[in-house]
């Protein structure tokens, strides 16, 4: 593991501060594709074990493409929220450069997910635990990235991420919950 990558994962403030100063879009894209591709490859290869190899690669490519679009759109949502709230010191390109590095916990958790897929049905708890751990670690790195790029404190960047997750919940999950509840009331 390169020293810069280690700094991003474990010494977040200093490592991210160095990366924001240099443009690292291609390296960030490489780490994103590697992290999300390997993690989703381990999980989906176990799920689609009976399918042909081309189908499994297509599922991995689709997962990486969808995750890339979602992550970049989420980065622009965060940039818009912070710009609306008055954090004008930020750089959207610097934030997008750091977003690929925030997926590195999935690369670290890939061996754990592989172990979970080899354990059978009880191993699914290990896979779910690895996924939850990687997502929480990714959110922490995202908070640190906002802190470094926009020169704000930890509490404000935490509040921004929490607010953005609440907005996404209201926009995408809440309508589905309401429709599901209405259907259950109509059926029952």
Spell out what each predicted region is.
Residues 78, 83-173:
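Hydrophobic alpha-helical transmembrane segments and adjacent short intramembrane/lumenal linkers
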């Amino acid at each position: 593991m390169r020293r810069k990558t280690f700094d991003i994962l474990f010494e977040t403030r200093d490592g991210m501060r160095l990366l924001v100063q240099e443009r690292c879009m291609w390296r960030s894209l490489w780490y994103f594709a590697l992290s999300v591709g390997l993690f989703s490859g381990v999980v989906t290869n176990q799920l689609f074990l009976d399918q042909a190899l081309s189908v499994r690669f297509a599922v991995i490519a689709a997962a990486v493409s969808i995750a890339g679009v979602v992550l970049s759109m989420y980065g622009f949502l965060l940039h818009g929220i912070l710009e609306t709230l008055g954090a004008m010191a930020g750089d959207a390109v610097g934030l997008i450069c750091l977003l690929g590095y925030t997926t590195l916990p999935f690369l670290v958790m890939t061996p754990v997910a592989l172990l979970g897929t080899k354990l059978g049905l009880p191993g699914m708890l290990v896979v779910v635990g690895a996924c939850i751990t990687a997502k929480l670690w990714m959110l922490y790195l995202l908070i640190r990235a906002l802190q470094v790029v926009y020169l704000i404190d930890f509490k404000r960047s935490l509040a921004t991420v929490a607010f953005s997750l609440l907005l996404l919940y209201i926009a995408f999950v809440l309508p589905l919950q309401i429709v599901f509840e209405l259907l259950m009331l109509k059926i029952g």
